[in-house]
């Protein structure tokens, strides 16, 4: 093995990006099969492949950072830049949905009845479940900040408690969103209103599930004493992501639920 005279981590070849891409293909194809042919085989295969890929990839990253010490300060700096760029790309991703919503709602066409919401659409009451969801996510933003401060102060017990509260609030939000979808008086097929509503809120809900998974991994790592006040970028990245999800929901609530109703 050649001597390494620099502080950067030269990552070894890994199969997980390939299996991750394969799982994405299987999952999206499986969703199509489920929607049109009511077959869940391909979807379940994709989700299982995705879960196994996440487990193996996280395992490798934990080994490299916690046990082998490859995540030096320059490497952590690069990871921070990477996470910032990723969140920036997510901002533009959601900007597309907001653009579609405002393009349709600010100048409704005659086909929509000339007003917004379109004729025949009964919007959800923004002061019922959506307001509760807003409170839940804002509370989770407070608890994740509490967890971060507890970690910086080496208060392990409070960090675990706050992280667990955040995860439970994330799960509660997801359940509330699912119940709202089931009871909604319109569907994704109901024109531009249904399309923009379910695409924007649905992708946000997916991000909440991803964030909850991210935080659950952080909780498991904290229980195994992986984080210190000086070395905890995995948790920091999860906290950034969660705050991003919070902010996106506030824009969704004000735009689609409140103003759009």
UniProtKB/Swiss-Prot annotation:
Gene3D superfamilies: 1.10.287.70, Cytochrome c oxidase, subunit III, four-helix bundle. This is Cytochrome c oxidase subunit 3. GO terms for cellular component: mitochondrial inner membrane; respiratory chain complex IV. It is a multi-pass membrane protein. It comes from Pongo abelii. The lineage of its organism: Eukaryota, Metazoa, Chordata, Craniata, Vertebrata. The chain crosses the membrane at residues 16-34, 41-66, 73-105, 129-152, 156-183, 191-223, 233-256. The keyword Cell cycle does not apply. GO terms for molecular function: cytochrome-c oxidase activity. Component of the cytochrome c oxidase (complex IV, CIV), a multisubunit enzyme composed of 14 subunits. The complex is composed of a catalytic core of 3 subunits MT-CO1, MT-CO2 and MT-CO3, encoded in the mitochondrial DNA, and 11 supernumerary subunits COX4I, COX5A, COX5B, COX6A, COX6B, COX6C, COX7A, COX7B, COX7C, COX8 and NDUFA4, which are encoded in the nuclear genome. Pfam families: COX3. It catalyses: 4 Fe(II)-[cytochrome c] + O2 + 8 H(+)(in) = 4 Fe(III)-[cytochrome c] + 2 H2O + 4 H(+)(out). Coiled coil: none annotated. PANTHER family: CYTOCHROME C OXIDASE SUBUNIT 3, CYTOCHROME C OXIDASE SUBUNIT III.
């Amino acid at each position: 093995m050649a001597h390494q005279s620099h502080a950067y981590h030269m990552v070894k070849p890994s199969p997980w990006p390939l299996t991750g891409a394969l799982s994405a293909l299987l999952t999206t194809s499986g969703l199509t099969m489920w929607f049109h042919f009511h077959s869940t085989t391909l979807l379940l295969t994709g989700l299982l492949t995705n879960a196994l890929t996440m487990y193996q990839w996280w395992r490798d990253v934990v080994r490299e950072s916690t046990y082998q010490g490859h995540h030096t300060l320059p490497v952590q700096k690069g990871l921070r830049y990477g996470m910032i760029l990723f969140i920036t790309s997510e901002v533009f991703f959601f900007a597309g949905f907001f653009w579609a919503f405002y393009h349709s709602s600010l100048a409704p066409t005659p086909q929509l009845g000339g007003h917004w919401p379109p004729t025949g659409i009964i919007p959800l009451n923004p002061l019922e479940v959506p307001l509760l969801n807003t409170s839940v996510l804002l509370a989770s933003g407070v608890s994740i900040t509490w967890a971060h401060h507890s970690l910086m102060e080496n208060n392990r017990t409070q960090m675990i408690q706050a992280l667990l509260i955040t995860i439970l609030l994330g799960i509660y939000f997801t359940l509330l969103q699912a119940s709202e979808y089931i009871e909604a008086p319109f569907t994704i097929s109901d024109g531009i209103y249904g399309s923009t509503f379910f695409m924007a809120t649905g992708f946000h809900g997916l991000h909440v599930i991803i964030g909850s998974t991210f935080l659950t991994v952080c909780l498991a790592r904290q229980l195994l004493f992986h984080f210190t006040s000086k070395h905890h970028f995995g948790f920091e990245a999860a906290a950034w992501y969660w705050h991003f999800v919070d902010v996106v929901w506030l824009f969704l609530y004000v735009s689609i639920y409140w103003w759009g109703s």
